[in-house]
């Protein structure tokens, strides 16, 4: 099969937060695809290997409102929408850099209808 390049794709994701009993599932644009990486056969303790991952380059932010949140809980959740993507180092502050993670549409709580 042909490896897809790093690019924005449409994906179903979920958002949820403490104090809101329901998870909201919807379509948005995320970065996905393959980046060329190198893994040297000789690893020196003095060398550092950097793996590049498919990550956001340009984004816009959108906000959704979660239903049935408790009084005093802000029902709004803001998330990035991928406009363009790039193969770059993974930034833990903004990206899921785990080797294995949950599906983007996984909900811990009940899904909102």
From Swiss-Prot:
One of its GO terms (biological process) is G protein-coupled receptor signaling pathway. It comes from the Eukaryota. Glycans are attached at residue 10. Coiled coil: none annotated. One of its GO terms (cellular component) is extracellular space. It is found in: Secreted. InterPro entries: Cystine-knot_cytokine, Glyco_hormone_CN, Gonadotropin_bsu, Gonadotropin_bsu_CS. Keywords: Disulfide bond, Glycoprotein, Hormone, Secreted. Disulfide bonds join 6-54, 20-69, 23-107, 31-85, 35-87, 90-97. Its main location: secreted. Pfam families: Cys_knot (PF00007). Involved in gametogenesis and steroidogenesis. PANTHER family: GLYCOPROTEIN HORMONE BETA CHAIN, LUTROPIN SUBUNIT BETA. Heterodimer of an alpha and a beta chain. Belongs to the glycoprotein hormones subunit beta family. This is Gonadotropin subunit beta. It comes from Muraenesox cinereus. The gene is cgb.
């Amino acid at each position: 099969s042909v490896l897809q390049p790093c690019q924005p794709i449409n994906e179903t994701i979920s958002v949820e937060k403490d104090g809101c009993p329901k998870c909201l599932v919807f379509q948005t644009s995320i970065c996905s695809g393959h980046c060329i990486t190198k893994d040297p056969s000789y690893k020196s303790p003095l060398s550092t290997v950097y793996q590049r991952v498919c990550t956001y380059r340009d984004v816009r932010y959108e906000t959704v409102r979660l239903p049935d949140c408790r009084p005093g809980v802000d029902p709004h959740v803001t998330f990035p929408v991928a406009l363009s993507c790039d193969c770059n180092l993974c930034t833990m502050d903004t990206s899921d850099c785990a080797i294995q993670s949950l599906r983007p549409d996984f909900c811990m709580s009940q899904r909102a209808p």
